[in-house]
């Protein structure tokens, strides 16, 4: 895998956090230098520690201070600016600006360490669109100068070559897949090169679901299996990967099992 920044996004409740943690665990177990990032939210520390998943925590205001400190040459002055009501309000009134600052922080880490891979548990699909679209919008606003040059560097990383891979996570319903396809088209329109649709919580993708076991399913599950099988067949050209519905006692068990699918052992 050549991507340095692997993004998981999608509607709420599709399982992008589970998949992004499983991807991170898989890369770690294969010997990669990898960090899990939950954008501007803090991860489940207990879960990450239990699975020994390394994580990078970013907070919006701290990232803004760090960025200004790099430009001004003084962390103290940057902190003073951040504390002014105007700048603090501006940062929260323009969410796209905050997205750019955090994305810039991630890219800076990746550029400083060529061995590093970051798996991003992205905000929900609407915020993820803002995150990538904002690089174009703010570039038009500024036109030239220091921030304009930083945006150029950011876009070179995001939209040139194969450094970024975006996984649009969807559930196995026709409507959800249509929405995922629209989201994929939007990301490609922004300039992203590698955008995949991955299906999660798929009943037919359970390895143990043999024809003999399918025949023993209760009627409602048998119907669900048939519908999902038809959906997978109808959209097979659009779906890059499918992940099974898992019944485990804990999220940690599900992450550990799903990591095997990323590693190719399933």
Residue positions per predicted region:
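Walker A/P-loop NTP-binding active-site region of P-loop NTPases
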Residues: 6-64, 132-136
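C-terminal lobe/tail of nucleotide-utilizing enzymes
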Residues: 159, 163, 174-266
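Glycine-rich nucleotide/cofactor/substrate-binding loop typically near the N-terminus or early
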Residues: 52-82
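Conserved beta-strand segments of the P-loop GTPase G domain that flank and frequently precede/overlap
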Residues: 9, 37-38, 121, 167-172, ...
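Phosphate-binding P-loop
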Residues: 1-3
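Phosphate/Mg2+-binding loops and adjacent switch elements
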Residues: 82-173
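Short, surface-exposed connector motifs at secondary-structure boundaries
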Residues: 25-33, 163-167, 213
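Switch/connector loops and helix/strand junctions flanking conserved nucleotide-binding motifs
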Residues: 44-47, 63-66, 126-131, 177-178, ...
């Amino acid at each position: 895998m050549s991507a340095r920044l692997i993004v998981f996004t999608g509607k709420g409740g599709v399982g992008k956090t589970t998949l992004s943690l499983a991807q991170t665990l898989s890369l770690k177990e294969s010997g990669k230098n990898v960090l899990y990032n939950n954008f501007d939210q803090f991860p489940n520390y207990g879960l990450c520690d239990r699975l020994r998943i390394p994580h990078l925590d970013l907070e919006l205001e701290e990232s803004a201070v760090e960025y200004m400190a790099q430009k001004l040459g003084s962390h103290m002055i940057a902190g003073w600016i951040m504390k002014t009501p105007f700048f603090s309000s501006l940062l929260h009134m323009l969410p796209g600006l905050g997205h750019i600052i955090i994305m810039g922080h991630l890219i800076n880490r990746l550029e400083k360490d060529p061995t590093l891979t970051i798996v991003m548990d992205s905000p929900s699909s609407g915020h993820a669109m803002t995150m990538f679209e904002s690089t174009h919008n703010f570039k038009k606003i500024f036109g030239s100068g220091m921030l304009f040059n930083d945006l150029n560097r950011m876009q070179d990383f995001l939209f040139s070559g194969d450094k970024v891979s975006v996984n649009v996570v969807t559930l196995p319903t026709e409507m959800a897949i249509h929405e995922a396809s629209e989201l994929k088209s939007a990301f490609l329109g922004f300039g992203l090169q590698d955008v995949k649709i991955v299906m999660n919580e798929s009943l037919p993708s359970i390895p143990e679901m043999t024809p003999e076991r399918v025949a023993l399913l209760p009627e409602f599950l048998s119907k669900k299996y048939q519908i999902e099988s038809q959906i997978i067949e109808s959209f097979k050209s659009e779906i890059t990967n499918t992940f099974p519905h898992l019944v485990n006692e804990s999220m940690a068990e599900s992450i550990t099992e799903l990591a095997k699918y990323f590693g190719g052992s399933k």
